[in-house]
Amino acid sequence: MNATPASADDLIVIGKIYSVHGVRGEVKVFSFTDPIGNLLDYKTWTLRREGSVEKQVELVSGRLQSKFLVAKLKGLDDREEARLLSGYEICVPRNLFPDLDDGEYYWYQLEGLKVIDQLGQLLGKIDHLLETGSNDVMVVKPCAGSLDDRERLLPYTEQCVLAIDMAAGEMKVDWDADF
């Protein structure tokens, strides 16, 4: 395990180690990618946890097991050593992500955008997104200059999202501010 070469601003969290698996140093991983197995496409991970030094690790192998992944990391052969990685976020540099088609966005690109309704009222900023099964949901939290102090949950659908202007850092939505 080495120090990480990528800057912290360049790293995107794609999963989290949450437990150990077996006695040979494998770890259980919760993947934030869709499909979840895409996390295994990235062979070098930067691990980080608040209050700890970032570590760079190499993925040797991995497999899907039920609703989580099991990963084998290079040089990690002991269950107790693997347990020490529990709670670490798995990050990769954003430049490794595949390019998307026009009009498609990664969640990290949407986080922080100002959300403005059709009347020009600032509803807040996108804090994060949730996967609900039927559609993704944007968690919009109040910010300086927003209409009120309410947190809103807006569907990330064609009916709700009218336009996204990445250069301006804004998203126009069809949403009643009272809802």
Curated annotation (Swiss-Prot):
It comes from the Bacteria. Belongs to the RimM family. An accessory protein needed during the final step in the assembly of 30S ribosomal subunit, possibly for assembly of the head region. Essential for efficient processing of 16S rRNA. May be needed both before and after RbfA during the maturation of 16S rRNA. It has affinity for free ribosomal 30S subunits but not for 70S ribosomes. The PRC barrel domain binds ribosomal protein uS19. SUPFAM superfamilies: PRC-barrel domain, Translation proteins. GO terms for cellular component: cytoplasm; ribosome. Its main location: cytoplasm. The keyword Cell membrane does not apply. This is Ribosome maturation factor RimM. One of its GO terms (biological process) is ribosomal small subunit biogenesis. Gene3D superfamilies: PRC-barrel domain, RimM. Keywords: Chaperone, Cytoplasm, Ribosome biogenesis, rRNA processing. PANTHER family: RIBOSOME MATURATION FACTOR RIMM. Pfam families: PRC_RimM, RimM. Residues 102-179 form the PRC barrel domain. Binds ribosomal protein uS19. It is found in: Cytoplasm. GO terms for molecular function: ribosome binding. The keyword Chaperone applies. The lineage of its organism: Bacteria, Pseudomonadati, Pseudomonadota, Gammaproteobacteria, Pseudomonadales.
